[in-house]
């Protein structure tokens, strides 16, 4: 490369396929070259006007490709005269919290739950996750690439971010609040596996470590693999635990199971967390369970497009203009706290980034407070059960074309799902195509923002019906696509 080569990020996106999804930049590892990651980091520095001699925190998940990407981002920061605070392997919310508390931007290297052959980069300003406006500015940025190495050795690890994160929970939850509980951790390749164990032991729990692996396993908390469904039930019989805790790869999405090894739906975990914390106002995507409104727990509920930036945007209007306690959560279980809270033990700082640890602690604490098992917590909620799954390797443009056709032609909906669900009442195109039927059944199709997948969410009066709706709807729409 010659000196001072200019690169347009928009053109780089098109040529590489590495682009912004629902949260952060995602793409194939083979396309995320040192040069590309260097360029994206310069665009981030340029968009946020990060001055030389500033500090930027970098952390990463446990994907094999993450250290190389982190090194390229560090090289770009060094070229721009910016100091890297390298936090090494750390949960995304821990990186975000540390950056926010220290008023510095942050970069998280993670592909979250997406397939093994992909990875990503999430960017944070000193105020939290960057907005869609920031993303648009980065997407049109023109950066000047120098004649330097696009990857340099990472600096020494700074452990402060981990301690900041642990202290957030220790300040709010009383010591020994989990005493007497047997809690299992499905460790797999979660970046939070050791941190969660340390936290639970410190709060008095007896901890059982299960399923640790050195190979990276992409866990999708909205489409839990059948092997993990069966594994949790087997472990429950063997180990007699009160709950089983896990997360996706970068620990911003919880995976919480009850004493029977039944994984709880993420939006139900979010609802129960908000109940425990005494939240007044909830922002949540259109795909989440309608039990949120039907429960009557909250003064206000706002529905958004899918993706944490949209949830954060909805939360911000309350945070700026209302004294209400504000939070948000998604169908994946990631919980965002918009208001600082206080308990008898101490304060819980706000964190407007998806978090997996808070919701798991809150739901377990709620069950202990009510002197019941986790499986009993949902029995007081309105009978609205949900399910979700996906068709992988399904091009996004195909998904969009099919959904546009269904939305434009009501007879197509009747042909596709009429004998399964009956007559439809209305459609919602806030994000994808959400079809509500007069029977009360809901089927929601949406292209994933992070990978070439078509997702399906369903809601019904019982779990078997919701599971059937998802399985049958995906089978039918796949056939519909090829006819």
Regions found by a protein language model. Give the residues of each.
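Residue-level detector of beta-strand face positions
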Residues: 122, 255, 434-436
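Short acidic active-site motifs
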Residues: 94-95, 231, 465
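Generic secondary-structure signature for well-ordered alpha-helical cores
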Residues: 30, 34, 42, 46-50, ...
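Phosphate-binding and adjacent anionic-ligand microenvironments
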Residues: 279-457, 463-483
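Gly/Ser-rich phosphate-binding catalytic loop and adjacent alpha/beta segment
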Residues: 2-218
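Phosphate-binding chemistry for phosphorylated carbohydrates and sugar-nucleotides
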Residues: 9, 162-373
